[in-house]
Curated annotation (Swiss-Prot):
It comes from Bacillus subtilis (strain 168). Transmembrane segments: none annotated. The gene is yjcR. This is Uncharacterized protein YjcR. Residues 43-53 have a biased composition (Basic and acidic residues). Residues 43-77 are annotated as: Disordered.
Amino acid sequence: MAEKHIQAYKDYVKGMKYKDLAEKYGVSVNTIKSWKQRHGWERKKGAPIEKSVHTKKGGQPGNKNALGNNGGAPQKNQNAVTHGFFSKFLPEETLEIMEEIQERSPADMIWDQIQIQYAAILRAQKIMFVSDKEEMIKELKKKRSLISEVSEIEDGLVISFSTWFRYRLYSETNT
């Protein structure tokens, strides 16, 4: 059976028809068709049919309708954007940063976060340094001044931070 389909293929390539192959090898026409499909038989085909090639571009000769128009959409056109979520709500700088992040590996990003956290802890140490228990920091939050003909009055809201409060803020930022 294996040799039959090889011999039948050779005859098929020479141009024999299914019916003639079936009679010669003593099998049905459908068996010949299944061999053709199963083993991928193909005959050499003649010259391809030539198709006319469209060479002219644009309108009729002398037509000035689209003179100077190169076609296509304007620059920075967003017609091809699927939904535009990011470009609609995020500024271009943020989008550029996101594109650069895509190039970095997750391990590099984790290492950067560790370094940033460590730097923040060291900076907080310097800011939150307490020299003694009684130290107080006073900040002027609001300042209001009233100038009249008689005198000048200044009023301000002063906020004081005690040592224990600063230490609490410091420990909260480290967690």
